[in-house]
Amino acid sequence: MPQDPRHPEHQYLDLVKHILENGARRMDRTGTGTLSVFGATMRFSLEDNTFPLLTTRRVFYRGVVEELLFFLRGETDSKVLEKKGVRIWEKNGAKQFLQSVGIDREEGDLGPIYGFQWRHFGARYETSASSYEGKGVDQIASAIAAIRANPASRRIVVSAWNPTDLGSMALPPCHVLFQFNVTDGKLSCAMYQRSGDMGLGVPFNIASYSLLTILVAHLTGLQPGEFVHFLGDAHVYLDHVDSLRQQVQRPPRAFPKLFVSPKGPRTEPEHFQYEDFELVGYDPHPAIKMNMSA
């Protein structure tokens, strides 16, 4: 499919405009209310070190990297991120929030969320401090092995949606599953997101799965190809409407470049550190305040 001849960020801006103009008004789990549409697709090239970190509002790059590495290590304690200044899971890990969804665990214990499912699918979850080494299905390792051994496979799929564990999660997965594809020496990734918060979540998710693709391409000796983003319920929270109306008026700027420059041996995805990635040329418009609905 050919790329939009305009700046690729217009895909995001146009979808936001479409939701603002045509979205169905709905109440939601958080009580905030949304404007919502069902079914959308965006495509972002990752070639030539391009990194689709949106420019019409500053995206929390450090948070993108640290959260992805947190998932790849199979970690589930939000305090690990908070110690690094990344507080995106703080509200969902709060004791009061956990109790409100019927979970009785220590503060910060998010349960069997993304990283646990990626690295230990099917294992019995105990606590965020428990060891799960050798337990469950390591979907990430299996995907990397498949890319190397059988790159033409159509089964290189990783799922975070485990119905038996949903009730134990602080928040069920919004980005549910992803699939890798190898074509002409290039690695691409398609991700399906059942629920997409267009203001805060989706810009973060675009960057996160693009980074995942770049990291796995590095490990498997491939070039990054494309990130394809499928959205189910794409929505704008009602308290984000004014902020997003402001954002869609801004012209996109050139996407930055991202280089993988490991500072030590990195043979497995969980070995990577924040310092192994170099972001060059990120020049976004100023931040726009938006509140998170938990």
Swiss-Prot record:
Name one matching Pfam family. Answer: Thymidylat_synt
Q: What is its EC number?
A: 2.1.1.45
For this protein, the record's Gene3D superfamilies field holds: Thymidylate synthase/dCMP hydroxymethylase domain
Pathway the protein takes part in: Pyrimidine metabolism; dTTP biosynthesis
Q: Which residues form the active site?
A: C174
Q: Which reaction does it catalyse?
A: dUMP + (6R)-5,10-methylene-5,6,7,8-tetrahydrofolate = 7,8-dihydrofolate + dTMP
The record's listing under InterPro entries reads: Thymidate_synth/dCMP_Mease, Thymidate_synth/dCMP_Mease_dom, Thymidate_synth/dCMP_Mease_sf, Thymidylate_synthase, Thymidylate_synthase_AS
Q: Which PROSITE patterns match?
A: THYMIDYLATE_SYNTHASE
Please provide the record's keywords in A-Z order.
Methyltransferase, Nucleotide biosynthesis, Transferase
Query: What's one GO BP annotation on this UniProt entry?
Result: dTMP biosynthetic process
Question: Which residues are involved in binding dUMP?
Answer: R29, R154, R155, R194, S195, G196, D197, N205, H235, V236, Y237
The record's CDD domains line, in alphabetical order, gives: TS_Pyrimidine_HMase
Kindly give the SUPFAM superfamilies that the UniProt entry links to this protein.
Answer: Thymidylate synthase/dCMP hydroxymethylase
UniProt keyword Phosphoprotein present: no
**Which GO-annotated molecular functions does the record name?**
thymidylate synthase activity
Tagged with keyword Methyltransferase: yes
| Catalytic EC class | transferase
GO cellular component annotations of the record: cytosol; mitochondrion
> Per UniProt, where does (6R)-5,10-methylene-5,6,7,8-tetrahydrofolate bind?
D197
Q: Which family does it belong to?
A: Belongs to the thymidylate synthase family.
Q: What is this protein called?
A: Thymidylate synthase 3
What species is this protein from?
Encephalitozoon cuniculi (strain GB-M1) (Microsporidian parasite)
